[in-house]
Amino acid sequence: LPEAQLDRFLMQVNIDYPAVEDELKIVQLVREENKKMLLQQGQEESVGREPSKIREPLISQHQVMQARREVLDQYMSPEVERYMVELVQATRTPERYHQELSEWIEWGGSPRASLALDRCAKAHAWLLERDFVSPEDLQQIAPDVLRHRILLSYTAESRGMDADEVIRRILELVPVP
């Protein structure tokens, strides 16, 4: 996809294959769920009802909306907010931070990158049951949010670098509040 379309994705999360034990658990869980579903359909058919195709939700729509409100209400101090924007600025004007960065980045993140960092950092803090965003939240989610928004230079690619390495370097160079 062109950069402008890639930028519309909130995150690019890299997921490894599960370990053998984890994959065994997945197989066993899915097998049990399938058995439960078949059993439920059989019971419904025996009483003359059409088998259910819609399962009961694990959480209600109200709970989802409440969680979204709580995420949006996460506090981000002006210093952390500035740090967040500086991380994105470092992808656009890398020479301000280090000459090597400017040799590695052809194209940096747009304002959507800052918006995505804001949303994801707040969600990350909420998942950790905090009511504020810390620089560590931004550092944790920065690779997933920025990796598809940075176009590496030929120099970086010829050295075998990837976006995650460049982001790690940005996180080292941008001063943390």
Show where each model-derived region lies.
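C-terminal engagement/docking regions of AAA+ P-loop ATPases
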Residues: 66, 75-78, 92-177
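Conserved AAA+ ATPase core "coupling" helix
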Residues: 1-69, 78-86
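Active-site/binding-pocket entry motifs
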Residues: 33, 90-93
